[in-house]
């Protein structure tokens, strides 16, 4: 039986990466998506073959076909969405960063443990073949004693635009309060820290 997934957030990352990944995963099915805007939720669901679009978290969590949620909402909302989902008995995979404070991260862990559900973080770069090879080389001592690590972040590919065209609307990641502070560290640097 397939694991029923819901995506909390209907932005560009869920549209371009998360929903297609769920669709390509054996024994996984995209059941629903949550957006603050019902029309956007419905359009996302139709585009990605989900069974339902919701604009209210309580309605999504009441859907018994959903086993797990992928929290892809603004950073400041991760704790609330994770805690609600865990209390409803749903497993949680959260986008990075986990939370915007240590207290919020601890609340997420404690609530998931108390409700017997799994909590994971979406650090997909851990599974890139180059990163797995680097990890093996370090673990096997093939590179000697590591004294310094440097991380560089690149975007886009040669000959491709760095970013998708913008709509002109301000994104949540441009609002320090919604992003939860941290600026580039929370948005990109967290991947480098995770890999280290």
Regions found by a protein language model. Name each.
Residues 96-97, 123-125, 153:
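Short strand-turn motif at the edge of the Rossmann-like AdoMet-binding core
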Residues 1-48:
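N-terminal Rossmann-like dinucleotide-binding module
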Residues 107-125, 145-149:
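Rossmann-fold dehydrogenase core element
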Residues 128-196:
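Predominantly a Rossmann-like dinucleotide-binding segment in NAD(P)-dependent oxidoreductases
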Residues 8-18, 61-69, 115-117:
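A broad helix-preferring feature
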Residues 14, 54, 93-94, 119-121, ...:
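Hydrophobic residues in well-ordered beta-strands that form the structural core
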Residues 51-111:
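Beta-loop-alpha module in the N-terminal Rossmann-like domain of NAD(P)-dependent dehydrogenases
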